[in-house]
Amino acid sequence: MSDRVGRRRRRPLVLVLAGAALAVTLAVSGSAFGGAKACGTVVINEQSWSGSTANTYVAKYVLEKRLGCKVKVTNVTEGLPYFQAMRDGKIDVALEDWDNTLGESGIPYVKDGSVVVVGSNGITGVIGWYIPRYLLKQYPQFKTWKGLKGKESIFKSPESGSKGMFLGGDPSYVQKDRKLIEGLGLNFKHVVAGAEPAQVARWSQLYKQRKPVLFYWYDPQYLNAQYDLVRVELPKRFKGCLDDEKQPGNAKKFACEYPSYGLDKLMSKKFAASGSPAVKFVKKWKWSSADQNFVANLIAG
């Protein structure tokens, strides 16, 4: 964690982790910390978003301080790579999976039992298209996707040419916005700034300049407390609607809103059967999006 937090902030952050860990500890049964078996090493995968970092380091604190575990943190990319790593025993636990990464990549691993879903982490995730509230006040029709039609040029950027810019998310995230734009018949060019920090830098700069910006975003996310953002209403979901643009299918099949996601905890089959006291703790782990955002905000500085 030393690469994430400067020395001047380490002690306050340790106190925050301790406080968050206490809240998590109180939320689970005392039996989660029982058992004579030694904990051993637990490998937790930290994904690239801030909420996952908060999950990982609060759990790490509890497991090390209360159960005597040795916790190793990995950073394997969301999707197929981390399901394969879990199958191969390189990852024991993931504390925030967005519905088996939103697509088909994880389903075979769950079906064959090599990856075990052990319940919700207590948080519901939302993905969508977002604009600043100041823009909605100027253009009330932007409340829905239909209001964007014919007004795309308002969002023009150097990269988008004559089209409006839609700022896509971190390329490692499962998304469908290229297909969604096509399916809705909107005149946007999908532009990628890079990983999430680069995307945030781009849209937050435009926000501070009070310029138009439309972008992929999600909740919970601690930055949502710092920026007044509004989710654009997309078409309602329909049977057969697709959510991963890597899936085959006509663009019309992607022309619906993202679903809400119950954020699951996952374990490898080997770890789930290990008898480690950490297994019981992870199964019982839950906290709120408010708690997660609070810790994520402090970690991010």
Predicted features and spans:
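C-terminal region of N-terminal signal peptides and the immediate post-cleavage residues
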Residues: 24-38
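Bacterial N-terminal signal peptides that target proteins for export
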Residues: 2-17
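Short, polar/charged alpha-helical segment
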Residues: 51-69, 181
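Pocket-flanking alpha-helical
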Residues: 56, 74-113, 202, 222-227
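Short, well-ordered beta-strand elements
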Residues: 37-51, 69-75, 163-167, 282
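Ligand-binding pocket segment of bilobal, Venus flytrap-like solute-binding proteins
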Residues: 83-85, 91-95, 165-243, 247
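A bilobed periplasmic-binding-protein/Venus flytrap-type ligand-binding module shared by bacterial periplasmic
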Residues: 127-137, 262-274, 281, 297-298
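A conserved helix-loop-strand patch within extracytoplasmic ligand-binding domains
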Residues: 114-166
